[in-house]
Amino acid sequence: MEQKKATVRLMGTIIDMLVTHTHPDAILEEAIRRLRIYEQRFSANDPKSELMQINHLAGKAPLAVHPDLFHLIKVGKYHSLAPNSRLNIAIGPLVQTWRIGFGDAKVPDAEEIQRLLEITDPNKILLSEKDQTVFLQQEGMSIDLGALAKGYIADLLTDYFKKAGVASALINLGGNVVVFGPSQNNEDPYWRIGIQNPMLPRAHYSAVLKIQNQSAVTSGVYERQLEAQGKHYHHILDPQTGYPAETDVISLTVVADDSVDGEIWTTRLFGQ
């Protein structure tokens, strides 16, 4: 068995993968191939992605989609409709208007935010189990899976690694960390996962987790920000107001068996 690492930039983030296998290069090459497919399926920033095809057809027609995409939208809708949830996968129009984290980010005026809030109702995402179709009832609606997709993709990669006979692995998908199998670098089998101190530069940790066969997901207001007219705006939007969530929380970490659950709950609970 040999341990190898690969780093690739996809989905607007840095992805690190570390695997232990008899043929680690082939495993990592296939993982990168799959990541490119997942990006084409789940991205809200690629106009040609399968998700964006749904959004382009908003108010016009349903679209039959890949089972993975259908499942993730179904899960996202369920958690978007939960009482007091900060997660709303129909928040796409607001995310694309604020554009926090991109070069063209701006603060929308209050009237525009109110107008966009009217097309962010997750109840108007219609799903057909029988046909595996997704239909957005109102023109202008758009789904954004940014609060779910990285975790879900990390879980898909983990499943692939296990089926391919990988003995142990670490996946760091833009802050979504998944580990399974024994760590090859410590005396005990547990992996050490550092939690970034949001007040200090990279690689300064406020805590170090010891985990195995689990995922650690961190959401924070310090990652992507917009400064305008002397105010700082972070990228985690409150689906009730359309503005960045007002909170004293800077960073929230959830440890879960599945990475997608960690993503769901960091978003649902952020600022509460």
Where are these regions (language model features)?
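Mature catalytic core of soluble alpha/beta enzymes
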Residues: 1-272
